[in-house]
Amino acid sequence: MAFSASALSVKTLGALLLVAADLLSAQTAPTHGVRPRRLAIRGAMVVEGNATPAEGPKDIIIEGNRIVQIVSLDPAAIRNGTARRPPADVEIDASGKYVGPGLINLHGHVQDERAGLAQPLEYQFKLWLGMGITTVRDVSSETPKTLQLRARSLAGEVMAPRFYVYARYAYMPVPRNEAEARQRVRDLKAQGVDGLKLFGMDKDVYGPVLDEARKQGLRVAHHMAVDETNALDAAANGLTSLEHWYGVPDAAIPDGVQHFPSNFNYADEGMRFRLAGRLWREADPAKLQDVLKAMVKGGVAWNPTLDIYEASRDLQRAETQPWYGEYLHPTLEKFFRPDPSNHGSYFANWSSTDEAFWKENYRIWFGAVRDFERLGGVIGAGEDAGFIYQVYGFGLIRELELHQEAGFPTLKVLQHATANNALILGQQENLGRVRPGYLADLVILNGNPLEDLKVFYPPRADAAAGPGGGVAWTIKDGIPYDAQRLLREVRELVSTAKRSSSR
């Protein structure tokens, strides 16, 4: 059968158009780990990060490492091909996907070893990026190493989130008077840190440390111990953020100190955390409200890290998390086993009675956190992973679920991990929102996080809710990362490490 010239030309033209379309698609597809000159995220539903409702479809245009334009689109115009779309060199099709600010982890620890065993930083960083975490406030890791990582991350030399380095204040010798305390703050400032991390504090040096930090332009995170200082001292002296919950219920106990048994030893972590589960019940409700109001008035933000103590209320859940098989590195697995030499591994002889007290603890704690925000306080979100059965990245997503359990609307939960965390960092003009002029730190999700926060977790074929969800792309500083590729590489890394450790 002979073909006519006109038929042949039409078929040839059609084939050429298909080839051209394939070439165009190949030219505009993002390259993992490479920042394009101009990137478009097409047709996304956008959750801005400021607790306003999702809106879309929208095109988000990025030039270099900044968002430069966000265009609202008419769905009908998209369907009939008449929508005016801003041009770009590279495109990500986000149709049916949700885009939000990259998550900020306000309480992270860069860890290259656990339980005396080396642990690759690649494992930690890829988990963070793979679950949409683009910024980490590192609180008291090895400062010189973390400062180097901060610089390398900003330069795009390492596949990692951006870091804000909060150095440990109380390294040896610990300052014992005002002059030494102020000098320590100045010394840390000279190293180039972004802030300070405090553990416990004596009253006579607490005020001078926070005063000197303000003079040096340093923000301060405080993990309070059972010590002289509490949340009222933080409020009076202008602390930036109170970590965990230490110091809040303590300040509301009528007698000024928890009713410890006579044999209590604070250095015994099993005893310490067992009694911590009985603390919130001793706080006077009316006095607790006064403490929360004082924190709000003093401008103290609260980063509760609800996730890191959850094993205390349900140990079996913590020990059997479904992603452990593929994502738990052998070094972490060893560190998590009950062992008094490993901080937070205190679960020898943990009982149902301990869990019952901790469940009550959480109920009161949830209420205090909710009241704090309703009074005008700023709530942040951080994971403190690498301890107490929490794996990097997974810990922050669990933190968001616990904020939801505490009663916060999901829009507010996401605000805690984005715009609020940026505010606590002093980066509210650069981070935490999907907005023109802001840094291009974004997460593109295969699902609606307002319906189910579990879309941040890696997809699982055997999940009861089905295999959907997961982060499609994480964009940090304008660099797109294929999140599922990162997580696949983590699984391979863990599998290799397990084989090596079993030899």
Regions found by a protein language model. Name each.
Residues 20-21:
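N-terminal signal peptide c-region/cleavage motif recognized by signal peptidases
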Residues 29-37, 46, 50-100:
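Histidine-rich, glycine-flanked metal-binding segment
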Residues 44, 348-357, 362, 367, ...:
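C-terminal helical cap
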Residues 84-89, 94-157, 173-179, 232-247, ...:
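Metal-associated gating/positioning segment near the N- to mid-region
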Residues 124-144, 160-168, 189-201, 210, ...:
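Divalent metal-dependent hydrolysis catalytic cores, especially in the metallo-beta-lactamase
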Residues 168-216, 264-282:
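Active-site gating/metal-coordination segments in enzymes
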Residues 188-194, 248-406, 494-503:
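Active-site neighborhoods of metal-dependent hydrolases
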Residues 439-494:
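C-terminal cap of metal-dependent C-N hydrolases
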